[in-house]
């Protein structure tokens, strides 16, 4: 295998041997991987989203499901129930009266769960930032993974946010968050 001096030669030899074995098996049509990599790959390609459309951003969110953008080609399918959803898209102005309902729906989602905050109102209160009845960002109620800016953001911006979420899942994994 490899010639190396030092205390960690066994680990280096194992890595070299694993790489050689993987090359030999790939030629025969096999693949070596870990269970965590397979789970991350499957979760990344089959995210189920739930809408929490509160205002005009929800119209742009609907555009992503239409044939022109077709977000389902990325494995991002809509679900009606929070118990079947991995991702919640908060789109629009979140009021103080609606905040407990948002938290309740978030708590019903299974782990790992992700939140996309869509639009200026969901990100930080937007146009209604100084109103007495508006929550100044949904991140005060639920943890947000991806922020999509704009008033309202375009469907392309939401698609980019979805792709960034998939990239984040690939990078961080899903078993231990």
Swiss-Prot record:
Cofactor: [4Fe-4S] cluster
Catalytic activity: a quinone + NADH + 5 H(+)(in) = a quinol + NAD(+) + 4 H(+)(out)
UniProt keyword Cell inner membrane, yes or no: yes
InterPro entries assigned to the protein according to its UniProt record, in alphabetical order: NADH_UbQ_OxRdtase-like_20kDa (IPR006137), NADH_UQ_OxRdtase_20Kd_su (IPR006138)
GO cellular component labels: plasma membrane; respiratory chain complex I
UniProt cross-references to Gene3D superfamilies, sorted A to Z: 3.40.50.12280
Membership in a protein family: Belongs to the complex I 20 kDa subunit family.
Protein name: NADH-quinone oxidoreductase subunit B
